[in-house]
């Protein structure tokens, strides 16, 4: 717990709040522009339309955002060359766990606030039908779980490389692959970690080529995909932790 508190104390001047505010602003702007182009017929499916497009926005924005947060958490020790000093006070495993816990809490707060903002957007735009509270809660949980899988990967890279450009390049590539993977067959998406934002979406889309009508419908993530997400997370966590423990300081 002391190490976790130390992480928050250390990051108080790392502009984490500004980074999170920028993420929310970009998502709000993106979705605002999207909804401004929809007609009344489209808005009848407003809640499903919102969650469907949020999955796409997550696939584009969150990989780089997660990489940025992980980098901000780890770069100070690299710049100050303080790893050896820290490891005299705590084991590498505990240091790794503290940073992972910090990332989990920051992402949880960020995504809960994001869900609250978009619930407010739905109310302001007067979406038809009752508010899908359960779906929003599950969507937030899924976004957090996928983001934590990506965070485990990014933290491993940020801890291993002193130059944070390597980790950020991975984040940029993840954003590109995240949205590109939504065009892949589902079997192929499962091999793209960043593709799980779209793979585990709660809303599907059906476009009728004859009538040219788009229909959205509720769907549930497959249990096999949930299991694969947990496997990816475990791999990134265990490998990242092992490399950090063996890293020479």
PLM-predicted stretches and their roles:
Residues 10, 75, 87, 158-159:
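Helix-capping/transition residues at the boundaries of transmembrane alpha-helices
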Residues 1-24:
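Aromatic- and glycine-rich beta-strand/loop motifs that create alpha-glucan
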Residues 34-49, 168, 176-249:
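Terminal transmembrane helical anchor/hairpin motif
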């Amino acid at each position: 717990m002391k190490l976790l508190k130390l992480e928050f104390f250390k990051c108080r001047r790392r502009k984490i709040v500004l980074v999170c505010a920028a993420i929310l602003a970009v998502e709000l702007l993106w979705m605002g522009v999207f909804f401004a182009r929809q007609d009344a017929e489209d808005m009848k499916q407003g809640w499903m339309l919102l969650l469907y497009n949020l999955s796409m926005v997550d696939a584009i924005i969150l990989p780089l955002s997660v990489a940025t947060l992980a980098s901000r958490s780890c770069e100070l020790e690299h710049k100050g060359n303080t790893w050896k000093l820290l490891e005299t006070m705590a084991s590498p495993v505990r240091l790794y766990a503290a940073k992972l816990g910090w990332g989990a809490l920051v992402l949880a707060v960020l995504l809960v606030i994001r869900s609250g903002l978009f619930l407010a957007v739905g109310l302001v735009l007067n979406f038809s039908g009752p508010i899908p509270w359960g779906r929003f809660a599950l969507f937030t949980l899924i976004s957090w779980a996928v983001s934590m899988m990506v965070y485990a990967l990014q933290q491993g890279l940020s801890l291993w490389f002193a130059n944070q450009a390597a980790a950020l390049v991975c984040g940029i590539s993840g954003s590109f692959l995240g949205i590109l993977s939504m065009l892949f067959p589902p079997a192929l998406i499962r091999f793209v970690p960043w593709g799980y934002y779209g793979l585990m979406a709660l809303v599907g889309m059906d476009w009728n080529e004859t009538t040219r009508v788009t229909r959205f419908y509720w769907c549930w993530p497959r249990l096999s995909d949930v299991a694969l997400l947990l496997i990816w997370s475990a791999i990134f966590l265990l490998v990242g932790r092992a490399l950090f423990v063996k890293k020479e300081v």
